[in-house]
Amino acid sequence: NRVAFAKMASTLADGKSRLLRKIAGDLDHGGKQVLKPDSTGYKILARFVRRVSGKPDDGPAVADYDAPPFFDGVEMMPPQRLLRRITLSLAARLPTKDERAAVERDGLEAVNSILDSVMKDDAFYDRLQEAFNDILLVRGYDGGGEGALSYEHFKTRLWYQDRSPRKGLSPEKQRELFPYSHPKMIAYTKLVNDYREGMLREPLELIAHIVRNERPFTEIVTADYIMVSPYTARGYGVYDELQDKFNDPDDPFEFIPTKIKSLTDRNGRKVQESATGFFPHAGLLSSFQYLKRYPTTETNRNRLRVRMYFLHFLGIDLMQLAPRVNDAAAITAQYEIPTMQAADCVVCHKVMDPVAGLLQDYYVVDGKGIYGPRKDGWYKDMFAPGLENEGLPDNERWRSLQWLGERTAKDPRFPVAMVEHVWYILTGRKPLLPPEDIDDPLFSAKRRAYRVQRDETERIADVFVEADFNLKVAFKELVQSPYYRVDGLASTVNNPRRRAELDDVGLVRLLTPEQLERKLTAVFGQEWGRLTHRESKFKILYGGIDSKAVTERMTDPSGAMGAIQRIMSNDVACKNVALDFSREPSDRLLFPNIDLSVVPGGDAEAKARIRQAIVHLHQRLLGRE
């Protein structure tokens, strides 16, 4: 390719490189002007033409920059503050005395074993599920929790209705005998809400199960099972066969792995082909909730699901890779099937449409469940089912998503994408994308920042793979990397290129409403409650999401957030200071050495105890000695 391109560059037109003239739009050709003569891209190409033509090089198109080592002048967080960051972020608690002592003694070397302990806490798995929902938004589908199950295939999905105290009563009697304030109606409402919450949690419980048991994280696309609770098992119609496997059959949030049988209709007739007799589970790929969250239509033809597949599991946003079509109307008029014939369309649809075909058995367009092949068969005006030039064998059709999951797990892009998810969980920011504007004077600095970060991501991905895809290893590697430990700059940076390199380095971020509530609980011993309560109006205002209409966490503070912070500071301070003084001094969290005899302006001992209390508060609230 280089030889052919060099030959083309050496060809002259009116004494000037034909390549340079065409690309500048001087010659009549279909591509028109591609680069302006004064652009950086043109200068780089002109330099290449001179070099292959044997002419002297007049220097780089962009001035050289003598870059220092990337983290030169960047200060790292002391081990004790790093420990506090880890335990608050991942386990919603302050470090224990033993953990602080271990770090004081062994420094960063102690962090590894402490992380092992942190990642056994239930709070870590709450955080893990919450964070992966931020990425997958799987809780945001329409129709309530049981809406993921079709009434046609799961006739017990509304099992809770048989337990309603209002069952069999007329509307008048229902309101008269069992108003919503009646204890039985309150209990019934809780049962329904717990069932729906369990259904919403199922895909996230799969993630937690894989990580908790240190199973290969590839199982998020290959697991031949789902997670069910005593309540959701009733929805699937499998509770009777599983009830002895639950530790507490009345716990709506105890989840165990199981398989469900291939689907039948309400009359028991087989509607799903299966060589094993079971539903062909493939982790999240075949999850009822995941497919319900990303539905399809007659015009979309599973392409939304394909976009999410590439984004969530391979780290590729197909929309960013798609070329911009100059004249869509002209292409539509010129080709009978543009998506299979027009070069501008084929470049994307050749990748997208075969994967869409793998989902053809999950083609419900009326919002009722997710399973059901298209009545008229799959579309003929789309590329055949498969993945990246590998066609789906006919005998694998019944398990097409398992076939896809097996190949996804072997794709080298999968571990990188998973490490990028961990990056987002820990930093609250998405990894850098390669800069595109080559004319940007800071392009080389931004490219270096991207490349160094990408190298670290790929390094961690390699360690992740060597550890048999144990996601805990990815967390441990990233927590101990310079990116997570950055604490600030040793001195002011004046060079604009250096500032551009370090622009995304550091961990200044807004806590989510859920994280802030957990931090308040860890510091003060009880939650505030007004950020995450079911009926709270503050959650969205403070940057929360509902996974449906609001899907992006806020990264910049707003006026509403400032107002909420003022309300919170007054509430938390008034409530917890008074509560702390009602306890015995030895049980206090905030003022362990202050009693009624200690007053400002008192004797030397009182002044010393006040100073000691300020130091204690500074350490407990801010984590600074």
Outline where the language-model segments fall:
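Secretory-pathway/luminal and periplasmic proteins that interact with or process carbohydrate-rich
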Residues: 55, 93-97, 124-126, 137-145, ...
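Secondary-structure capping and boundary motifs in well-ordered enzyme cores
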Residues: 74-83, 107-110, 120, 124, ...
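Non-catalytic, conformational "gating/processing" segments within enzyme and secreted inhibitor domains
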Residues: 129-236, 240, 250-262, 269-276, ...
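Sequence context surrounding c-type heme c attachment/ligation sites in exported
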Residues: 1, 13-16, 21, 27-45, ...
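Aromatic- and Gly/Pro-enriched helix-to-coil junctions and flexible linker segments
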Residues: 1-138, 234, 376-432, 439-442, ...
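Short alpha-helical scaffolding segments that buttress acidic/His motifs in well-ordered protein cores
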Residues: 19, 82-90, 114-119, 128-136, ...
